[in-house]
Regions:
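C-terminal catalytic histidine-bearing segment of alpha/beta-hydrolase fold enzymes
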Residues: 95, 254, 262-313
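Alpha/beta-hydrolase fold nucleophile elbow
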Residues: 166-177
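Short beta-strand/loop motif that positions the catalytic acidic residue
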Residues: 235, 241-243
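Short substrate-entry loop that stabilizes the transition state in hydrolases
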Residues: 84-88, 93-141
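Mobile cap/lid helix-loop segments that gate and shape the active-site cleft of serine hydrolases
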Residues: 103-105, 109, 194-231, 237
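Short glycine-enriched nucleophile-adjacent loop
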Residues: 180-191
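Alpha/beta-hydrolase active-site loop
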Residues: 144-164
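N-terminal cap/lid segment of alpha/beta-hydrolase-fold proteins
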Residues: 38-86
């Protein structure tokens, strides 16, 4: 995880600016899905990186589990499963920063202005899972920078769906910053999530620093297949993208909102919030909506008033 520091904001602003990368808007008439575009493509890594760090033992809030992905068995933190015989909603959460690696940052108490733990979900009784990804911790494989990691996220969802206490029809996905970018790509690759919540994603990964891009960035196709702004038409379940108006990837959100014609994609800029302060109140709001989202299809929506209220001055 390695929580994103406030110093990252200068980089985040760059991510949201115009750059020589891939267009947020596919060429006219290009409706190839992300899944189709990825099929048969072999990424070529310029660097083979893995963290080589064991997964820290969690407190009783979580248990360490392993799930099967195309890269091999990967570690994750998962909430203890309720023993009440009922089916419960669950959420996969992808952290920001080094989203391939999990550590004690997912349970340490954090200030409300920078709470990257997404603890509102577990506090509401929602089953949580923080998956590590290929090349993270002491996992097999190498970091691919938003490519093979998409398959890992989908494999983690398959694992969750098999747990006896989890309602397989009420599995949600969320993530922040780099994790927000990855969950958008997952939403563009599968319809298996009831709803997806992406905080502060990039539309085009070309704006990220080299530490997040271990592939040949001069290869345009490598960038295209990792840039969610190009594949918004591929979204197949409700997706909600959030960013604060004060700092962060606001320009990326605005670019995607302008280019998207997909009715399943919703973009919310939250007045007065930053890339970090948006997390605590908005995840609490999402958790409350998940608990009420019990019908045959998701009924989750957001109003600007309820999103902006915690930041009103």
């Amino acid at each position: 995880m390695r929580n994103l520091p406030f110093a990252m904001l200068s980089l985040l602003v760059v991510v949201g600016c115009q750059r020589q990368g891939t267009s947020s808007n596919p060429s006219a008439g290009n409706q190839t899905s992300l899944t189709e575009a990825r099929r048969g493509f072999q990424t070529r890594l310029a660097r083979r990186e893995s963290a080589g760090e064991p997964v820290p033992a969690p407190p009783r809030l979580f248990v360490t589990v392993h799930y099967d992905s195309p890269a091999g068995k990967l570690a994750a933190y998962r909430s203890p499963l309720p023993q009440d015989g009922k089916k419960h909603p669950a959420i996969l959460w992808i952290t920001g920063g080094d989203c391939n690696t999990i550590d004690d940052g997912v349970w340490k108490e954090a200030p409300p202005e920078n709470d990257q733990t997404a603890s509102a979900f577990r506090k509401a009784g929602i089953i949580m899972m923080f998956p590590s990804l290929r090349g993270g911790n002491d996992n097999p494989g190498f970091k691919e920078g938003f490519f093979g990691e998409v398959d890992d996220v989908l494999a983690a969802a398959d694992y969750l769906a098999r747990q006896t206490a989890v309602d397989p029809k009420r599995i949600y996905l969320g993530g922040h910053s780099t994790g927000g970018t990855l969950v958008l790509l997952a939403a563009e690759s599968s319809d298996r999530f009831r709803a997806v919540f992406s905080f502060g994603p990039a539309d085009d990964v070309a704006g990220y620093g080299p530490e997040y891009l271990p592939f040949n960035t001069s290869d345009r196709r490598e960038l295209e297949l990792r840039s969610p702004g190009r594949w918004l038409h591929s979204i197949q379940s409700p997706v909600f993208v959030f960013e604060g108006t004060q700092q962060g990837n606001l320009r990326a959100l605005q670019a995607m909102a302008r280019s998207s014609s997909n009715s399943l994609a919703h973009f919310h800029s939250v007045r007065g919030a930053t890339h970090f302060s948006i997390l605590a109140p908005t995840t609490k709001l999402i958790a409350a909506k998940i608990l009420k989202d019990t019908g045959p299809a998701s009924n989750i929506t957001f109003s600007e008033e309820e999103l902006n209220r915690p930041f009103a001055r």
